[in-house]
Amino acid sequence: MAYSFTEKKRIRKSFAKRATVHQVPFLLATQIESYTQFLQAETPAARRKTEGLQAAFNAIFPIASHNGLARMEFVSYHLSNPPFDVKECQQRGLTFHSALRAKVRLIINDRENPGKVKEVKEQEVYMGEIPLMTSTGSFVINGTERVIVSQLHRSPGVFFEHDKGKTHSSGKLLFSARIIPYRGSWLDFEFDPKDILYFRVDRRRKMPVTILLKSIGLTPEQILAHFFVFDNFTLQSEGAQLEFVPERLRGEVARFDIADKNGRVVVEKDKRINAKHIRDLDSAGTKLISVPEDYLLGRVLAKNIIDPDTGEVIANANDELTETVLENLREAGVKQIQTLYTNDLDQGPYMSQTLRVDETADQTAARIAIYRMMRPGEPPTEEAVEALFQRLFYSEESYDLSRVGRMKVNSRLSRPSGEGSMVLQDEDILETIKILVNLRNGKGEVDDIDHLGNRRVRCVGELAENQFRAGLSRVERAVKERLGQAETENLMPHDLINSKPISSAIREFFGSSQLSQFMDQTNPLSEITHKRRVSALGPGGLTRERAGFEVRDVHPTHYGRVCPIETPEGPNIGLINSLALYARLNEYGFLETPYRKVENSKLTDQVDYLSAIEEGKYVVAQANATVDAEGNLTDELVSAREGSERETRMVTPDRVQYIDVAPSQIVSAAASLVPFLEHDDANRALMGANMQRQAVPCLRPDKPLVGTGIERTVAVDSGTAVQAMRGGVVDYVDAMRIVIRVNDDEAVAGEVGVDIYNLIKYTRSNQNTNINQRPMVKVGDIVARGDVVADGASTDLGELALGQNMLVAFMPWNGYNFEDSILISERVVAEDRYTSIHIEELSVVARDTKLGPEEITRDISNLAEAQLARLDESGITYIGAEVEAGDVLVGKVTPKGETQLTPEEKLLRAIFGEKASDVKDTSLRVPSGMSGIVIDVQVFTREGVTRDKRAQSIIDDELKRYRLDLNDQLRIVEGDAFQRLERLLIDKTVNGGPKKLAKGAKLTKEYLAEIDKYHWFDIRPADEEVAAQLEAVKEAIEQKRHEFDLAFEEKRKKLTQGDELPPGVIKMVKVYLAVKRRLQPGDKMAGRHGNKGVVSKIVPIEDMPYMADGTPADIVLNPLGVPSRMNVGQILETHLGWAARGLGQRIGDMLKASAKAQELRPLLAQIYNESGKAEDLDSLSDAEVLELATNLKKGVPFATPVFDGAHEDEIRRMLDLAYPDDIAKEKGLTASKQQVTLHDGRTGEAFERPVTLGVMHMLKLHHLVDDKMHARSTGPYSLVTQQPLGGKAQFGGQRFGEMEVWALEAYGASYVLQEMLTVKSDDVNGRTKVYENIVKGEHSIDAGMPESFNVLVKEIRSLGIDIDLDRY
């Protein structure tokens, strides 16, 4: 196998037993593809599909005027180039967007002859701004990165369910059906406890369902014919004859003697009719059975019976037969009658009963009844009734099932799936009611609403399209009204279309929708997980309060589609999920997962993606099934899932149709990063997966020694590590940029064959963590497309590195690791292992106030020179300044209103003039509890305001950097051109040239080297073709120079034009502080198995427990944290990490002894190729083997993939290889090499029992004590109660609550209690007096009335109770 540029630097030894046929798909594909399909920006207008923006335009246009004389048609749209790039938008607080322009055609017909077109006006109209997605799947809205989370909602279609017996006290199941469109009114059908079937529209008042059936044109006779089979009777003078249908009689109790045609009694009265009786009647050729008169009574007629002579209706359909009715029938000479066949078991009389409840006479009355239900109180005119009924379910404007909905309706109603209109059909309603009645009759199954075949994902593109369509429909209303005036006032399309409704709908969605979230940017994993999140909440989804247990639970169809582990703890559990590693969306928005095809028990290389519904038809085996070298399933029985319930059963191999593509298919990206996940309890695995997202990037990232092999995929797909867009040779590298000269075969003709990667340096993330990229390549390195050329935050050699590898000992230590506390060695802090950099953004704005403009200046009165020392002449701090809490970062003064002057101020004014008193100092200072180094300053100035020197110097620096990029591109372009020229000119005959070159002379390399390259163009070749080529190269270079000059000019214009600032703001300054946070007691740490704790103490290195060879442990964890939590994965990780460290030390020792590559190869082969996946070490050169070995000195990285990881015997083998007996003895290892005899650092004595010691990857989480630590002396008070505010953000105090008061009462500390309740809280006069007393040096307290008592008195008075306090 071929290794990439970075992979061969440090190969991760994998223990995977199964080769992967299907690579993990690009992790951000769902987001990026969805939005690309929405915009279709790159697709030519003629070839655009009807989706996204195109679909929205097609749905609204054409718009016709009310009189039909004018109409506006949509032609096409295009998106302009964004005015600012992503970085500029973030700096300036703008939205990264593109202007949408649509070409529309206004057609005006002739008034006299409406069929004739009078004039056509075509124009491009501005339709608002559409935010663009960045290359990593996020959006920049008002300068901050946001993510649109996908929504999991109930799919449009038809669903059948029952209430599980909860509605009625008897526990009777009440069945219901619901037709849910994508857009439009919901239609519900439901049985009540009396078995009458009702319908509702949009959850309004219920009405008998037969009203709906009558309104679509059915008569009572037709309704009964649809829902019942009939019994045929021939009336006789006494009794009747029943047409014999065998199946209808079985199981019934005979109410009379039943005889065959020969008169032989086959079934006696009151006997139950069984199969033998039926056979006897059948064999006797019985066609008719004589029944007595009372057998007819109570039966229900199926059809209207009309007197053949008079045409009079004798009996109506659905009438019960009574003696009177029978008598009338006989009198009229009616012989044949049909009645409804019903029974108690599987043919209930539900529709017949419903018809009796229904009081409407015909179609018109039914529609009026529906109108009254929808519009109570409005008079039902014929047109209004008809219009409302059509609009409810039959109008494409107001009702849309969508392709998904039509497909789901058709498949549930057992029709061919793709066909049908997007509105409801009469047959849809009829079929739905039939299925519902059948369910009540005990036939068929209800739907499972939590099945992923009934829930679909709405992605960014679809959500944005819905918003855009909503905005466009508002525009449509306005255009409709104005179209009538288009002809008379000679209006153009842009006069009719106002883009504001579209812009505001889009802005509202991206800015404040529940699904538009502030991106979690703590580390690369949190970014990628946030973009792969699927939420059941949001508009059109569930709410936390109403979501029950079933919706939140793991469902069998989640397998391979949604992760069963990763979900938040708390009220959102189960409502917010993560996509599984291999999951993707199909065209309908349903989640699919890949399976490998199995034919005749043999695995093929064909991989098919199946949705939850499709999967139900197949038998799917698990990835851990035993397979031989040829790919045959060898076990007699294989564990597989089959049936719609997806129950796991043991099946024979020949029945298997598909097999999982990979064991990690079930879990999400975060869960698949947990090694030995299969050995962890699910609850702890959930915490482990969630806490990895909170890991703070460390100053020096350290790859996990025990990983799962997915680390590289996550790092690269998140966009944190920089990938080469095209292959080539590294031409230039510094900390800020990498320049790559692109390979000739990958460069596009006519374009610059240079790729420049400007690295992100010390940039603030949304969570204030530091994003910094470091180059990994050297000049001259050859890289291929997709190779990692620079590491980002939390990545190490292109692999995700969230924490640090720590030497962990599991043992108690003086109670300092009680209850999950963590003991840390001082060495960890000294080596900056967990030091992280956090970047704080502090900003100040200078506004134009009523009293005059605020000014950013260094000239501030009442400030000592020492406080201004860090400010430059413009009043802004310089980069590199070390600042602490209270230091001035930006000097600012605000004009003050004229006030009564004190004598002191009058004196100052007399001495210093006006300035001293009429402004107040409102400078930007470093907030309390913060200190750091200024790393960047941004100055934004309003258009028309003169820039200060600092702002100008920032612009000059930016232009200088840009010019550098252009110069590099030009240098490489010219270099290539001159190389081609040299090859072209050498040995060519010339007519003359510089330095008196003689005619007829041949050009030599030496001659060309002597003259300046630009003078080569002055050479006059004898060959005309060569001369033409020379001229062409000269023109090409000049053209490129011209292009670069234009680009530079455009950049200068962009930087020098005024900035867009909020109204009233003249100038804004942003100062970025880098704060260094070392690990300290109170910081939260965690492993990857849900084993979290708080640092309790940092112990001097000499006091830590140490091994026999003197190596001290880095961290001491409590062994009691493992058994009850059942996350044994951490112990296995510790053992394997211990082996990894040992192998690294062995390789390091060999390198110290100057071992050659050939000596290293046998050990490397033992490590990599004795178990698990084999590595192709022979393909590496000796230099590459030495580089690999150098990178392995700190430990050989292992990959133990989820559910396919290292077994115990493999861990033992690695431990034996890492610690041969001589080394093991020296370190004090036990025979198993999994435990060590440790010594107490303080006494030097060995501990009584051996201790589990090894290497674990530990993370420092974002809950840092520095962010929580807070102290207040005096500060702000609440306005009403006058009590101190709460919380760090408000600079609040600590609440002394009810229970704390009890504690002081219990101690009898009455004076302390009094001051707590008065002067330290809300006794306003008392606390002022205390301050005065302290200043005077008196230590006495006069406690007064707490303000909260006055509030209580006022509140009681507000209830009309006169309460007053008698003061004695």
From Swiss-Prot:
One of its GO terms (molecular function) is DNA binding. The keyword Transferase applies. This is DNA-directed RNA polymerase subunit beta. It catalyses: RNA(n) + a ribonucleoside 5'-triphosphate = RNA(n+1) + diphosphate. It is an enzyme of class 2 (transferase). The RNAP catalytic core consists of 2 alpha, 1 beta, 1 beta' and 1 omega subunit. When a sigma factor is associated with the core the holoenzyme is formed, which can initiate transcription. CDD domains: RNA_pol_B_RPB2. It comes from Cupriavidus pinatubonensis (strain JMP 134 / LMG 1197) (Cupriavidus necator (strain JMP 134)). Coiled coil: none annotated. DNA-dependent RNA polymerase catalyzes the transcription of DNA into RNA using the four ribonucleoside triphosphates as substrates. One of its GO terms (cellular component) is DNA-directed RNA polymerase complex. Belongs to the RNA polymerase beta chain family. GO terms for biological process: DNA-templated transcription.
